[in-house]
Curated annotation (Swiss-Prot):
SUPFAM superfamilies: Zn-binding ribosomal proteins (SSF57829)
Designated name of the protein: Small ribosomal subunit protein eS27-like
Protein's gene: Rps27l
Similarity comment: Belongs to the eukaryotic ribosomal protein eS27 family.
InterPro entries: Ribosomal_eS27, Ribosomal_eS27_Zn-bd_dom_sf, Ribosomal_zn-bd
Length: 84
């Protein structure tokens, strides 16, 4: 284990492991994503840490269910992280 570490230029892996407030530049862990329904192929915008069950607008199937942290996507759903 090296004693000398560059604190001003940490590696990307080190920064991702840190708590969101202890990073060099603070950034949230949550994001919005576009989820495609496997039945009707409609796209719905969902928060990554959704706290309620999200249903499809077209066919009323469950797209994701809440857990303690991130929402769990239903099997067959595909998603894309939205750019801010």
């Amino acid at each position: 284990m090296p004693l000398a570490r560059d604190l001003l230029h940490p590696s990307l892996e080190e920064e991702k492991k840190k708590h969101k407030k202890k990073r060099l530049v603070q950034s949230p862990n949550s994001y919005f994503m576009d989820v495609k329904c496997p039945g009707c192929y409609k796209i719905t915008t969902v928060f990554s840490h959704a706290q309620t069950v999200v249903l499809c607008v077209g066919c009323s199937t469950v797209l994701c269910q809440p857990t303690g942290g991130k929402a769990r996507l239903t099997e067959g759903c595909s998603f894309r992280r939205k750019q801010h």
